[in-house]
């Protein structure tokens, strides 16, 4: 059953089984953005038949969306010059590629499926690819759709959520007259080809339930006024920004005191730690109790 009754739109949980089986999904972004639908298939499931369907029935640019880490491992640079990325929505076009072996001209559905398989294979490096090639690559932002609500990030996120490699193949859907298909067109298209629609906005809402902070380091910090603290360093998965928590004694539910991040200057940081500890520590017989905790 669809999320919105008898329409072709579905929730994330409903499309993940399709993604795992290699079925296509139509990814639709916000109306105030591109307002377009892209055919999507997980890169691990990108067969020659899937690529041919995209070419015949999608009609747009067939692209391989990869994580930042993967594009670095493959030596793929962004296609920009000193003027920077001038695309309207910041699409990160990277070097187009062909597989070095097992392809002809690189353009056929078989060749592009082969190039995709090589690009996402474990152990593949820059030497296994020819550049420039016929398959366009895209670099997704770390953080996925929580960092950028684009088809590129949605493709990577959806493949990862399905338990597959974080890479997806996308192709814009165009109408027969060459115009871009909008939601009314996409709903008819989805019913005709029996493909489910997923709004990127729903993927954003789904991902907001994930844990976005992880602990990266722990050490001790001696202070002249309050003794020794445990110093815990956490990192925000979206902005890779560090936060520091100072802990002394048993941690109980408390309110949180926030300070601006000043960890880039160790001298300034140390001075602020000492002054702030004085403000938040109350003296008890033979002990200090922290409350509330400080986070930088």
Question: PLM ranges: what are they?
Answer:
Residues 1-295:
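Catalytic domains of riboflavin
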């Amino acid at each position: 059953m669809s999320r919105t009754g008898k329409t072709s739109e579905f929730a994330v949980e409903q499309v993940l089984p399709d993604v795992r089986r290699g079925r296509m999904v139509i990814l639709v972004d916000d109306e105030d953005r591109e307002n377009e639908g892209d055919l999507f298939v997980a890169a691990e499931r990108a067969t020659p038949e899937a690529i041919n369907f995209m070419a015949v029935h999608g009609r747009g640019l067939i692209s391989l969306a990869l994580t930042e880490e993967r594009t670095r491992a493959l030596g793929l640079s962004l296609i920009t010059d000193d003027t920077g990325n001038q695309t309207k929505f910041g699409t990160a076009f990277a070097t187009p590629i062909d597989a070095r072996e097992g392809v002809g001209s690189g353009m056929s559905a078989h060749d592009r499926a082969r190039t995709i398989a090589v690009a996402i294979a474990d152990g593949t490096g820059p030497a296994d690819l020819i550049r420039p090639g016929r398959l366009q690559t895209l670099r997704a932002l770390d953080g996925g759709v929580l960092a950028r609500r684009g088809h590129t990030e949605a493709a990577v996120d959806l493949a990862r959520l399905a338990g597959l490699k974080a890479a997806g193949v996308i192709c814009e859907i165009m109408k027969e007259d060459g115009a871009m298909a909008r939601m009314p067109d996409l709903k008819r298209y989805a019913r005709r080809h029996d493909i489910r629609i997923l709004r990127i906005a729903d993927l954003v809402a789904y991902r907001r339930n994930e844990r976005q902070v992880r602990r990266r380091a722990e050490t001790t910090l001696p202070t002249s006024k309050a003794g020794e603290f445990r110093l815990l360093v956490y990192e925000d998965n979206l902005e890779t920004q560090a936060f520091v928590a100072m802990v002394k004694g048993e941690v109980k539910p408390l309110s949180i005191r926030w300070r601006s991040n000043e960890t880039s200057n160790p001298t300034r940081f140390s001075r602020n730690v000492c002054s702030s500890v004085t403000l938040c520590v109350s003296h008890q017989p033979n002990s200090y109790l922290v409350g509330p905790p400080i986070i930088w």
